């Protein structure tokens, strides 16, 4: 449906008209810098930056109810730039024209209710938001859609020489970055990713290679790769694609917008369970809900439950003892969250202290709980990754310990697709998970192929089928 056809029915203008004043804002010293630059930390105090619209209050000329109507009706529009996360254009990067938006099918992922058996096991009815159904099969596509749309606009306006896009990754970021960069003209950009050697799944390694990126394997863990990338962004003209780049956070806020929309724009009774790695995602989710609250689109904030493995849980320890200390991680099946010094932790701390003080918690789960949860959830109609298993395990534990009340509604963020982590499932079935994970396969969750003769009667007997009763009635 065209904007004109829908507007005639809706009696409200659905196209973006907002005139923003976009800046980088330092979360440390508070200084602002024009957004038409490639900045990742404050030039004055080196603190992290966030993207801010200094004309945000102009959006309040519409009521919260009117904004809800706009966002709901835009789903029916046949406008490519508004099909993905930029449906919420005014709340993402409103200075980027729709013509510069890069849309590869990201966003609007399903919210799937747990069936009765799974809800009973978890301790409450809950939903899984399956971000593994994004184009590169992870939530990182949300941030890449905003970052690469920003870059596409930057290239058109500034006309720079070839830009090198770079990221450190545990697998999902590299896949998304390489995919979205590959959509831009080859003469305009180059794509490079740094991965910790031997610490990503074969599927995740294959994705950036398939998209044509230069893949550099580095000894160590993600934190080692990130240090190198930070040095490169400080000293060379490159475009950072990790969540330290605030324009990436803008796109990841869309997760919060979609959850609110899918839950009927009422979230004050909702708890969102989020696996935490580099902490960019939980930062974006909290910022997204704050934006909705500021415009009256929602009337209250949800609870946010961060979840971390006991092999990489600096945020959970901070929440428990009130002191943050980076840690050396141990191997985790939740590889995308195996990060001992989350880059975005300062943002998390600020958001919790200012907005989510009594609405944020972070819980630690074991590797055993993560794997058992993933295996069980996927036996009940879902396709969650190990991080999704981590989120559900965290919700189950929080319910059992009374850290969240059972009377509310619950959403678990499955950040990636099961198939990216199929190797962990296979190793669980075979009882061959590496000793460092500390996971023992539970017989009731193990499933292996069964060999039978190529004979219908033999297979029927093996399956315990009973012969069908013959109908003795007559016919014409």
Enumerate the predicted regions with their spans:
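PLP-dependent amino-acid enzyme catalytic core
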Residues: 1-476
């Amino acid at each position: 449906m065209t904007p004109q056809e829908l507007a005639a029915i809706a009696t409200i203008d659905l196209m973006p008209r907002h005139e923003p004043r976009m800046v980088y804002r330092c979360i440390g010293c508070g200084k602002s810098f024009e957004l038409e630059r490639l900045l990742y930390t404050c030039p004055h105090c080196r603190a992290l930056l966030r993207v801010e619209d200094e004309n945000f209050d102009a959006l309040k000329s519409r009521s919260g109810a009117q904004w809800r109507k706009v966002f709901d009706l835009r789903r029916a529009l046949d406008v490519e730039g508004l099909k993905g996360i930029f449906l919420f254009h005014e709340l993402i990067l409103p200075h980027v024209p729709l013509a510069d938006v890069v849309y590869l099918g990201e966003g609007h992922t399903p919210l799937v209710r747990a069936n009765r058996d799974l809800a009973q096991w978890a301790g409450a009815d809950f939903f899984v938001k399956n971000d593994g159904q994004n184009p590169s099969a992870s939530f990182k596509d949300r941030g890449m859609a905003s970052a690469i749309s920003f870059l596409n606009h930057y290239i058109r306006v500034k006309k720079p020489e070839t830009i090198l896009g770079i990221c450190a990754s545990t697998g999902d970021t590299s896949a998304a970055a390489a995919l979205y960069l590959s959509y831009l003209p080859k003469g305009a950009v180059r794509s490079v990713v740094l991965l910790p050697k031997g610490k990503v799944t074969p599927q995740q390694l294959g994705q950036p290679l398939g998209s044509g990126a230069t893949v550099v394997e580095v000894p160590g863990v993600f934190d080692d790769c990130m240090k190198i990338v930070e040095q490169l962004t400080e000293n060379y003209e490159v475009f950072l694609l990790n969540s330290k780049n605030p324009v990436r956070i803008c796109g990841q806020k869309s997760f919060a917008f979609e959850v609110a929309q899918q839950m009927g724009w009422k979230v004050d009774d909702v708890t969102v369970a989020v696996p935490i790695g580099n902490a960019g995602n939980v930062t974006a989710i909290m910022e997204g809900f704050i934006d909705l609250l500021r415009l009256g689109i929602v009337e209250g904030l949800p609870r946010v439950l961060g979840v971390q493995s006991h092999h990489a849980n600096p945020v959970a320890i901070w929440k428990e003892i009130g002191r943050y200390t980076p840690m050396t991680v141990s191997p985790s099946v939740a590889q995308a969250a195996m990060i001992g010094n989350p880059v975005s932790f300062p943002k998390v701390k600020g958001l919790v202290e200012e907005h989510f003080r009594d609405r944020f918690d972070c819980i630690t789960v074991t590797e055993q709980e993560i794997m058992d949860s993933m295996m069980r959830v996927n036996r009940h109609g879902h396709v969650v990754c190990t991080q999704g298993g981590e989120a559900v395990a965290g919700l189950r534990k929080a319910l059992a310990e009374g850290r969240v009340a059972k009377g509310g509604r619950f959403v678990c963020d499955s950040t990636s697709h099961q198939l990216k982590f199929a190797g962990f499932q296979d190793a669980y079935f075979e009882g061959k998970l590496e000793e460092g994970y500390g996971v023992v396969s539970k017989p009731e969750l193990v499933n292996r192929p069964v060999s039978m003769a190529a004979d219908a009667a033999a297979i029927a007997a093996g399956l315990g089928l009973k012969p069908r009763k013959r109908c003795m009635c007559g016919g014409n």
